[in-house]
Structures are given as structure tokens and as C-alpha cells.
């Protein structure tokens, strides 16, 4: 995991994501719905629901929208979303993992396949690239106005049950066992830290350098995938040139 900064990629696309806020709310609503269906509507006893609710609040999703999604998940509505994972290679041979929540797998598969092929990539068989990624809990703490050095932060992370810490001038990035994410988050917050994000994610074990002439194509492919209403997350094992 050394040298890989998920936060750098997040910040690089932040403005574009802000412009898609309506789509972000729609996707979070589906995640809330699925979390409630799986574990009930009480965030105190449903750790996944609490994580998604925190994600919704961080995205400035209105409370009414959150409540509607939770209420819908608590009922017996007609929606029947399924979690689906697609694997493939983007331009330059970059491994890409796509997670989706869909009520129509045929529609979603066709759209994802089109995004790959349209930009010079290709879908692959199940298992082709998923082994290249590890499921991790991921927490970010901004260093702006934070008077804590890296050694102190590392001790606090380990005491909280975290596995690894990466630091940059802008932020501390913390990685955890996925099952311990909620506990680590709670411990850090109890210690007075303000978290920018706390989520489950997929971290590539190794990054592949993106050829300069493929950067734009790969980014356009990722954008098209993220624009799809059914797609919840896109992960790429990409090392972009400076």
C-alpha cells in the first residue's frame, strides 16, 4: 500500500463530483436502502448504515432525503436492488473494478461494457482483476488546522485499532481491517479528531503507470462509469503521471 494515495485521486476529481451532486445523492440513497434492507433502520445496531449515513452527511445530503431512503428500505417497496461487480481493463491495461447497485442487471452490464469499449478498454471474466485489490476501511483526517505530528498520529491510529497510516502535507490517510472500520472511526472521533471521510474501499496492491497518451482516455472512461446511475464505486490500479 506504500506510496498509494487514494486521497490524491479523490481531490483531483472533487470539483467534477461536486457538479454531479444530484447523482451522488441518488447513489447514496440506494446505498442507504440496501444497508437498511440488510441490517435494519437503526444506525446504532447497523454499522454499515451508520457508515453510509456519515457519507450522506459529508456530501451535504439533505436530512429529508436521508430519511426517505431509510424509510423506503424499512418498507416493502417494489425495488429490488442487487450488488454487482464488473472487472476489466482500461486504456493502457489498467485494472478497473466497478461496483454497482442495480434493479436491472442487463441494463447495467450493457452500459458498463459500452463505457469500457468506447474508450479502448474491455470487460474481463470474474476474478480477472479483483485479486489485485484488497478490501479496506479507509479514513481521512485533514491536516489543515491540525496540530498533530506524524508520530503522534501513528500512535493514535494504532491505539484505535488501525492497520496503517500514510501522510502528506494535506492529510493523514488511515487504513483498517474492514470489520474494524466503525470501531476505529469511533475511537478517533472520541480522541477529538474530525474525519473528512470514513468508508469501505478497495485498495490496489500495486499500481500500473498510465502511459501519457492514455491518461485522457482512461479518465473519460472512469467519468462515464461514474456518471452511470447504477454505478456506486469505480476503483482503478492507476499511477497517473505528474
From Swiss-Prot:
Its main location: cytoplasm. GO terms for biological process: regulation of DNA-templated transcription. One of its GO terms (cellular component) is cytosol. It holds the Pfam family TACO1_YebC_N. Keywords: Cytoplasm, DNA-binding, Transcription, Transcription regulation. It is found in: Cytoplasm. GO terms for molecular function: DNA binding. Coiled coil: none annotated. Residues 1-21 are annotated as: Disordered. Belongs to the TACO1 family. PANTHER family: TRANSCRIPTIONAL REGULATORY PROTEIN YEBC-RELATED, TRANSLATIONAL ACTIVATOR OF CYTOCHROME C OXIDASE 1. This is Probable transcriptional regulatory protein lp_2253.
Amino acid at each position: 500500500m506504500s506510496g498509494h494515495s487514494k486521497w490524491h485521486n479523490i481531490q483531483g476529481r472533487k470539483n467534477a463530483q461536486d457538479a454531479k451532486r444530484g447523482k451522488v445523492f441518488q447513489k447514496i440513497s440506494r446505498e442507504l436502502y440496501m444497508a437498511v434492507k440488510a441490517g435494519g433502520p437503526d444506525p446504532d445496531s447497523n454499522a454499515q448504515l451508520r457508515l453510509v449515513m456519515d457519507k450522506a452527511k459529508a456530501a451535504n445530503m439533505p436530512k429529508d432525503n436521508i430519511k426517505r431512503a431509510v424509510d423506503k428500505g424499512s418498507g416493502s417497496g417494489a425495488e429490488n436492488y442487487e450488488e454487482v461487480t464488473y472487472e476489466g481493463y482500461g486504456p493502457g491495461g489498467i485494472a478497473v473494478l466497478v461496483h454497482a447497485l442495480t434493479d436491472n442487471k442487463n441494463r447495467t452490464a450493457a452500459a458498463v461494457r459500452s463505457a469500457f469499449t468506447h474508450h479502448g478498454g474491455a470487460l474481463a471474466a470474474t476474478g480477472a482483476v479483483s485479486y489485485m485489490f484488497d478490501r479496506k476501511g479507509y479514513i481521512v483526517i485533514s491536516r489543515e488546522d491540525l496540530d498533530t505530528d506524524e508520530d503522534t498520529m501513528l500512535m493514535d491510529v494504532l491505539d484505535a485499532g488501525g492497520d496503517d497510516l500514510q501522510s502528506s502535507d494535506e492529510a493523514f490517510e488511515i487504513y483498517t481491517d474492514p470489520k474494524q472500520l466503525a470501531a476505529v472511526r469511533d475511537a478517533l472521533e472520541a480522541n477529538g479528531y474530525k474525519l473528512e471521510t470514513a468508508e469501505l474501499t478497495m485498495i490496489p496492491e500495486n499500481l500500473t503507470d498510465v502511459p501519457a497518451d492514455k491518461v485522457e482516455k482512461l479518465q473519460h472512461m472512469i467519468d462515464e462509469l461514474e456518471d452511470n446511475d447504477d454505478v456506486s464505486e469505480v476503483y482503478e490500479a492507476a499511477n497517473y503521471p505528474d
